[in-house]
């Protein structure tokens, strides 16, 4: 009679082979050449995992796992975190950090890939808002943390993440970054204020929303005047525009206006 380990035959059939933690599945099929531990992570119950990791293998054998992907499987299964937190591989340390293990330690890690995993979990945020990498600070903003502090961050991408959380858009109305102002305009903020913005793409958004057309009809940018024409504003003026696309668009609205007048 076949020996029963976990009671899950999909797992036990491998355990009967007296496998090591580094075993790769050699049965042809979906999991061929997958590490057994990755397989266990996908199909094992909490009880299955506990039995295999603690009774069948044991910590001493797990510490000897080889291969980055196999070690990552051990970490994702929740074992040997302290040991692998000291790994020379930033990929392995980052995986430990993903588990929320010792965030204050990893907040000072030399690798930004490790620190960002801490930030993504919203941990050690009081440390990471001062991180030298803007990507890490941005991850903290994306967790809706310390927005009052990060609102004045020198990096526009961080400030953009702060705004994206809905934090006090009025603070960023005249932001020096056109990217930030463009984002606000796209969201429909301060359109009247942006009628005279230096960035054409922002003025174009304003025109598309039908704001400030009396000013934008004279804009030096052809694309913006085209947007004004699309709104059907003053076609009798724009049919004489210097740009052919603007004139053609204005003619459509001019003819429509004339036919409407004739109808009435």
Task: Name every feature range the model reports, one short phrase each.
Residues 2-264:
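Alpha-helical scaffold segments
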């Amino acid at each position: 009679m076949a020996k029963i380990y976990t009671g899950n035959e999909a797992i036990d059939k491998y355990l009967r082979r007296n496998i090591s933690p580094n075993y790769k599945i050699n049965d042809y099929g979906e999991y061929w050449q997958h590490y057994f531990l990755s397989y266990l992570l996908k199909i094992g119950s909490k009880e299955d995992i506990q039995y295999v990791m603690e009774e069948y293998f044991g910590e001493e054998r797990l510490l000897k796992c080889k291969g980055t992907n196999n070690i990552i499987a051990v970490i994702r299964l929740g074992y040997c975190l302290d040991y692998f937190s000291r790994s020379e591989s930033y990929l392995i340390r980052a995986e430990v950090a993903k588990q929320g293990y010792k965030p204050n330690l990893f907040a000072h890690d030399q690798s930004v890939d490790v620190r960002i995993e801490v930030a993504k979990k919203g941990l050690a945020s009081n440390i990471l808002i001062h991180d030298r990498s803007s990507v890490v600070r941005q991850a903290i903003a994306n967790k809706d943390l310390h927005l009052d502090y990060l609102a004045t961050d020198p990096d526009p991408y961080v400030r953009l993440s702060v705004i994206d959380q809905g934090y006090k858009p009025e603070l960023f109305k005249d932001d020096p970054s056109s990217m930030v102002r463009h984002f606000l305009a796209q969201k429909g903020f301060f359109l009247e204020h942006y009628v005279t913005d230096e960035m054409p793409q922002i003025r174009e958004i304003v025109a598309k929303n039908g704001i400030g057309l009396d000013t934008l009809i004279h804009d030096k940018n052809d694309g913006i005047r085209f947007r004004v024409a699309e709104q059907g504003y003053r076609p009798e003026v724009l049919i004489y525009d210097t740009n052919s696309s603007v004139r053609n668009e204005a003619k459509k609205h001019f003819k429509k206006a004339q036919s409407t007048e004739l109808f009435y």
